[in-house]
Amino acid sequence: PIADYEELARWWDKYAGKRPLFIGEDVERTVKYADPQNPNSHQLNAKRRLHNTLPHVNGTVLWYAKNFCDNIGNYATAMRNGYWKYPALQPMMPFIDDKAPKKPKHVKPIWTDDGYVLFWNAPRGKKWNDVAVKYVVYRFDKGEHINTEDASKIVAITPKTFYKLPYEDGKKKYVYAITSLDRMSNESRVAKKKVKL
């Protein structure tokens, strides 16, 4: 017998055992069958709403990847334009490590042959779980509250210790905030720099 998706998802959520839960989702079935609550729509929106109500669901694993790339039922378009519109950090694994690395140091914009570039130094780390492996670059308007929970402010997630700034005429003021990520996606405090672009 075929199990009900919502029933399974709630069961998985209940017995997640304080571990990250990623629900496998068949792209083709999701767009092939109607939402039982809304027969005029396929199941994508209903599944997203359900996932958002379940506290242990950290994401979705899609299969087959080809179906996503082929944009069956406009699935990929809906994800790119709505649910996955902004960059995201990997889910944290606090049961392995929950200590954040130190923040980047010496953040400084410099003119180079390639344009205006924001540079920073990697923080020191003694053990594998203290070392910064990536950096998140956020951009905020001058005077705007620095909120690293707002993914719409992410302009880059990079292993590099620099970011090429989109210079225009030097009249617009921004604050760039850079954080360090370790291998478990623990995020450091913010290192800030005001720039004029």
Question: Where are the regions that the model predicts?
Answer:
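Solvent-exposed loop/turn segments flanking beta-strands in beta-repeat/beta-sandwich domains
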Residues: 123-149, 190
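Pro/Thr/Ser/Gly-rich low-complexity, intrinsically disordered linker/stalk tracts
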Residues: 74-130, 183-197
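Beta-strand-rich modules
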Residues: 165-188
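Substrate-binding cleft of secreted/luminal carbohydrate-active enzymes
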Residues: 1-2, 9-95
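Local beta-strand/beta-hairpin segments that build beta-sheet-rich folds
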Residues: 149-156
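Hydrophobic, well-ordered secondary-structure elements that form the walls
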Residues: 60, 120, 137, 178
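Short S/T/G- and acidic-enriched coil/turn segments that sit immediately N-terminal to beta-strands
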Residues: 158-164
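Exposed beta-strand and adjacent loop surfaces of beta-rich binding modules
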Residues: 115, 132-136, 173-175
